[in-house]
């Protein structure tokens, strides 16, 4: 590394792993209410006979939650969300380049689209397998409607939720919805990582941007839109299935068929606007932060290794 400027030193796998988890947590802190609104809109209409609060639009959903459940309600499940990102994003984003390099044939100048898709599917599936319990708990908290300040709470806290689910539903309950989630996140990861990778590469090759904030912003925004379009149907099924009580759905396929029968095919795009607002904003914040963190961490590493 002698003679190289910090910005020229390729980031190590450890730097990418830690940087991705940290950047994802920062993005979650800023966009979590949008994710909660998405979950509420996705499960609305699931039980037609139930008397429940009706949500209209993203802002309307958040305002209704604040009015009926208190100002902290849009951040319900945040702790589990941060648990999720530290394990989930670190793997699916932080290991993407390493897995892509592993799949790329030796001597190849660059990775093909097929290789990038394969890498995205691989890290997405790996991440879900490790982080699924955190996602189940996050969704349960986000979907839990607690009217008034004295409303009943099923879980006393995040750790209690892990224990309660394992006790009442078995350890398998913490991995409920793993298959639809693997499908969803393989799709999301491909759309996000591959789209970001390709857009950024083309912008740099065409000299429209240098490798800086505008380039990262445009690439991340495009990645967020593509991810929302292709992943929304699976995301709705995943949310419904993970949040459902025992016995409501026999399988993710049964959940999907019941949705179509009761609500029509448009149900697959319930919560699309908050999904896009959240994924678009999340991607911009995460990728921009991630790129800067990689540079900062490598600068620290180079300065520590440099004798002068």
From Swiss-Prot:
Which phenotype arises from disrupting this gene?
Homozygous knockout mice lacking Ucp3 show no overt phenotype being born at the expected frequency, with no observed signs of abnormality, illness, or increased mortality at up to one year of age. They are not obese and have reduced free fatty acids and glucose serum levels. They show a normal circadian rhythm in body temperature and motor activity and have normal body temperature responses to fasting, stress, thyroid hormone, and cold exposure. The baseline metabolic rate and respiratory exchange ratio are the same in knockout and control mice.
Give the record's membrane topology: Multi-pass membrane protein
> InterPro entries in the record, alphabetically?
Mit_carrier (IPR002067), Mito_Metabolite_Transporter (IPR050391), Mitochondrial_sb/sol_carrier (IPR018108), Mt_carrier_dom_sf (IPR023395)
* Domain of life of the native organism: Eukaryota
Entry GO CC: mitochondrial inner membrane; mitochondrion
Q: Which UniProt keywords apply?
A: Membrane, Mitochondrion, Mitochondrion inner membrane, Repeat, Transmembrane, Transmembrane helix, Transport
Regulation of catalytic or functional activity: Inhibited by purine nucleotides and inorganic phosphate (in vitro).
Location in or out of the cell: Mitochondrion inner membrane
For the keyword RNA-binding, the answer is no
A GO BP annotation: lipid hydroperoxide transport
Pfam families in the cross-refs: Mito_carr
Which residue ranges are recorded for the region named Purine nucleotide binding? Answer: 275-297
Q: Which residues lie on this side of the membrane: Mitochondrial intermembrane?
A: 1-10, 97-116, 197-213, 291-308
Mitochondrial matrix compartment segments: 33-73, 134-179, 234-267
The segments carrying the Solcar repeats are 11-102, 111-202, 211-296
Q: Where are the transmembrane segments?
A: 11-32, 74-96, 117-133, 180-196, 214-233, 268-290
- Care to name a GO molecular-function term for this sequence? oxidative phosphorylation uncoupler activity
The subunit structure is:
Interacts with HAX1; the interaction is direct and calcium-dependent.
Chain's role: Putative transmembrane transporter that plays a role in mitochondrial metabolism via an as yet unclear mechanism. Originally, this mitochondrial protein was thought to act as a proton transmembrane transporter from the mitochondrial intermembrane space into the matrix, causing proton leaks through the inner mitochondrial membrane, thereby uncoupling mitochondrial membrane potential generation from ATP synthesis.
Q: Which family does it belong to?
A: Belongs to the mitochondrial carrier (TC 2.A.29) family.
UniProt-recorded name of the protein: Putative mitochondrial transporter UCP3
**What organism is listed for this UniProt entry?**
Mus musculus (Mouse)
Q: What is the lineage of its organism?
A: Eukaryota, Metazoa, Chordata, Craniata, Vertebrata
Q: State the gene name recorded for this protein.
A: Ucp3
